Amino acid sequence: AISPRECLIAKLILQGGKRANEVLTLHTQNIDWQRRKIIFEQSKTKGTRKATVITYPQSVMDKLKAYLGDRSGLVFITRTGKPIMMTRLAHMFEKAGKVAGIPFKVTPHVLRASTVTYLKQQGFQDTDIMKVTGHSSAAMVCAYDKTSQESNATEKVQLVS
């Protein structure tokens, strides 16, 4: 079975197309309970920092609050209070994928790509998606987009008759 903690990690990654490391390094001070927003800090190369702000459904915020209790600091920790390592997270996702009967290896990165693909299918522009995922260019967004070549604007618009 998938633990409530693992489920929350997956939901935070999926809603915002977040990198696993952004979720694992999340601190309670970056959560705005009133506005249902979480600020994710991105460590970029060359030492620059960038942040993305993601709005979550109230149901997710309620589960997150219940998970945290009155604890502060790192949001996701082990039973012994240590940070969750990326290798551990990868193992949790792989196990969850097998339990769910998914025929390919499930990783946090798969969820990130799924977010981009879904937002593209819903008609969001690359610039809107970049604000969510923190991608630095439209080219990177396109690299994550897994929609088929056949699925394009000509399915929705008839320019000629």
Residue ranges with predicted function:
Residues A90-K131:
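Short, basic (Lys/Arg/His-rich) helix/loop patches that form interaction surfaces
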Residues T45-K65, G73-E94:
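C-terminal catalytic core of Y-nucleophile DNA break-rejoin enzymes
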